[in-house]
Amino acid sequence: MALDQNVRLVFDKINDAKKRSPYNQNVELIAATKTRDIFQIQTCFDLGISSIGENRIQEAEKKLKELPSFNSIKKRFIGHLQTNKVNKCLRLFDTIDSVDTLKLAKKINSSSQRPKTECLIEINTSGELQKKGFKPKLSKELISCFSLENLDIVGLMTIGPYTTSEKEIRGSFQALRVFKDQINQELGENKLTELSMGMSNDFELGIEEGSTMVRVGT
């Protein structure tokens, strides 16, 4: 399928899933552009996508320097970030959507040259050992992230379980939604507003369970 047809199909599926969702939320489509070239990214932008997600610093650095609409597209880092690459990541990206340890959060906080760096905290709701992220518990380490003055933590992110079971996938997304509410209650404010749940294979389920961001390969 041609890229433009694929993007339009994804938008249609998002709109249909929103109608099935009881949460009446806005949903941001993040185009996961790994392996896509700058011309394909520009096509996505022209079709109405305003956010892209990259998960490899080196690959992203080459592309983003050449992208004509560099300043108009919101650039999100969505992969596992090593602490030794934080400085470069901050120069390239507007947000870091995969803060998975307190150590990483502190490194971003101390390295940021901005008043605030927008972030999502990654939560491992599936319990799969190969996945990164905090456990869905109100641990001291997790709560400490919210006291870092240079971080603007706006929500949570999770990756659904590697399964064909719709029940298990929904359960993982439901757990993140419930945990967001628990954190807001613990903090005494509605600080967290965003839920990044759903990728190419399960983004419709994510939206039905309240996701406000989906990461879809184009």
Identify the role of each PLM range.
Residues 211-218:
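Gly/Pro- and small hydrophobic-enriched strand-loop and loop-to-helix capping segments
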Residues 1-201, 207-209:
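Conserved alpha/beta-domain cores
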